Amino acid sequence: MALASGCTLSNTPRRSLAELRTALLNHDADTAFRYVDVDSIVRCMVRDIFAKYESKADDPLMILGIKAGREAAGLLMPAVAELARNRVRAAILSPDEGGYFEYVQKGSVWYLDIATDGKTAVVNPIGKPETKFRMRQMEDGHWKIVEIMRE
């Protein structure tokens, strides 16, 4: 059995997260984006925001406003995703004076609870129940973060 990247098995979520950690610490944005789907994360965040408002909408005008907002968000999504990608790339390439990756520097892929179901995994840093994210396995076998899940 092949072992790599600090004794993590290849083609596992943990291995992809170890590769992502290395890319972030090396300020290697291109490699980091191999393991993070910013477009999908932004789409999921927008979806969740509208779902939250829809669950609280109780008058027709509010429902109409939410529907209009959802349509506008759909039209703006490519520009928003590009802006998010550019900001993430800038953060990765920066000397990290803002402390973006302080948790990554201190962390280890072994402090993650990873529940895999087929080609999907839910990852939860141990001791941080409010922080979860979903990963999907790509065609070539590596895993990519596709959604940040908030309780």
Where are these regions (language model features)?
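C-terminal motif of bacterial Sec signal peptides marking the signal peptidase cleavage site
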Residues: 3-6
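Bacterial signal peptide processing site
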Residues: 8-10
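Short, aromatic-enriched amphipathic alpha-helices that serve as compact interaction elements
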Residues: 12-27
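Residues that form generic nucleotide/phosphate-binding pockets
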Residues: 23, 35, 52, 83, ...
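Short, well-ordered alpha-helical segments enriched in acidic and aromatic residues
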Residues: 29-39
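Short, charge-rich amphipathic alpha-helical segments embedded
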Residues: 39-57
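Long, compositionally biased
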Residues: 56-77
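Exposed beta-sheet edge and beta->alpha loop/turn motif
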Residues: 74-151
